[in-house]
Amino acid sequence: MSFRFNSQAFEDNSFNEKIREKLTQALNSSSSDSRSPKVTKTTMGEGSTSKKDSGSGGKSRKFDILKSGITVSKVNFPTTPQLEILDLDISAQPRSLVKGICKISCKDAMLQIQTEVEANLLLVYSECSPSFATPNMICNDSFTIPITMVFSEIRLEAITNIFVKHSGIGISFNDVNLDFKFDCSMKILQSTIERRLKNSMHHLFKEVLPSVIFSMSQSLFLSEAARNQEMHNESRGDSRPSPRVVLEESDLQELSPANMLRLSTLISSRQTLSLHGTVLNVPSTIPGCLERQNLHRFNSRIPSLSNYYASYKEEEKSRQVEVKKSVGSSVPLPHTSFAANPNLLPVRTLQEGAYDLPTITGIQNRIFERSTDENERPRRRKLKIKMSGRKQQPQAPKEEEPKQAEQQPETEPQQQRLLPTPEIPSREQASTPVDIDPTVSTPDSPDTEITSPKPLSIRNPILSDVEKMDSEDASAKSFVAPLKLPVSITSKYFNYPADHISAQTPRRYSPQRINWEDALFNTSELSNLRTSLYSPIARGSLLNPTKERPDRGRILDNRRLSFVGLNFKGGKWGDDDDPPPYSG
């Protein structure tokens, strides 16, 4: 079963006006119970509040940012709603006449709401919080912002239970499908309000809309006398005289031009969100307090070299910005000391010579006067220059210098006469002894100073690379300090053959007598290790060359050797002898 609504009733503006009034009344009545205390007057952060006690005093008060009531300014139904009756129960019950289940669908509806909210959330929380937990604010005045919300393209599909009673129509929504577009005049608060509206839709269809429909249906069930009585009561309420503001002579002083100017600046500051000097309790009126928006002006008036040469500073900043854009943000730019300390001259002023010394002196004096006391004396830099001449040295030592130069060539042949430098024998002449002139006699005194002969570069195959490097460094030195030989050393000390000299090599580099024919050293692993490139003793001349075994590739392919050196345990070493290079 279904029926159609009269389309002319929806096209008539009177129906929209009734809907607008009923929605306004329903929204304000539902929000009045849960509204927080409204601030009526604020003085130095302390406000007097008018509280509305709810039914139960034990419930906690909810924070509400609504400053005024909700006003539905416009309602429009371009498309006629549709109502479909799914189930109907007509029974002679004492409480209801008709009971049914219906499906309601509405499309392209529009609703516009206007209200005012409190922008100072600190005031809302401070008035609803205990006094011991609320700090004393310097400026905690109320600041209201008007907001207009428009709901367009509303699409509603719902399953409802309808109860027709003697006094009106009761309705409840079971299954609701709602979609709409939301637009707010405050774009900053649009996302927040939209999120809160979605959470409050349950309250809207559970309490607000049923009360609106029931109040509108009462006009159909009330008698004519009751309707006339209600209209008469409304007219009496409208005919009450509105209260007038009566000003006394004492109040005229508060309406002075200065107070009116102060009130006008207060209103303009709330509308533009700006702070003026005429408003009380703002940082600009507090002595010694500086606002953030005026900080650049204060810095520009400070006497400093950077402010006097501001044009050079701006050019350097623009140049750094251009370099940063061209190079990229990943490359760090060098930090200039001029940017860190503003009381410095730019480099360009020094290069171009555009500075003025009297001006710089005046700026420095003003900075010193502002930062120090009058009784404090400035610390001047003093430069002391001694004008005393240098003492002239006597010329007597200059005459002695040529004498010393003449004596030096005489001492050199004497040293050569004491001990001639022996020639370096070659490897072929290593077996021949080194002969020294027998005519040279050693002095009898034990502390005879003689020059040491140049060391003999005898090639020993057993010496390691480290010993060779030491011998080369020793031979490279051109100057050798004079040596003092003991009395026991005579000229016969230098007549030993070269094989005795080679026997004086360090013990750790001397060859060890090892029996290589032992069965311990003839294993396949050690034989391959001697002839392989990776052997640490492959270059030594002590190993006997042997033929390569056929299994040599097994060790060469596997380069991850499981040993460090030769595990030689057959030789017995004394306490005085050094161990071999590779010992287990």
UniProtKB/Swiss-Prot annotation:
Residues 368-377 have a biased composition (Basic and acidic residues). It comes from the Eukaryota. The keyword Transmembrane applies. GO terms for biological process: mitochondrial genome maintenance; mitochondrion-endoplasmic reticulum membrane tethering; phospholipid transport. Residues 21-60, 368-459 are annotated as: Disordered. It is a multi-pass membrane protein. Residues 1-218 form the SMP-LTD domain. GO terms for cellular component: ERMES complex. Residues 378-389 have a biased composition (Basic residues). Lacks alpha-helical transmembrane segments, suggesting that it resides in the membrane via beta-sheet conformations similar to those predicted for other outer membrane proteins and porin. The SMP-LTD domain is a barrel-like domain that can bind various types of glycerophospholipids in its interior and mediate their transfer between two adjacent bilayers. Component of the ER-mitochondria encounter structure (ERMES) or MDM complex, composed of MMM1, MDM10, MDM12 and MDM34. This is Mitochondrial distribution and morphology protein 34. It comes from Zygosaccharomyces rouxii (strain ATCC 2623 / CBS 732 / NBRC 1130 / NCYC 568 / NRRL Y-229). The lineage of its organism: Eukaryota, Fungi, Dikarya, Ascomycota, Saccharomycotina.
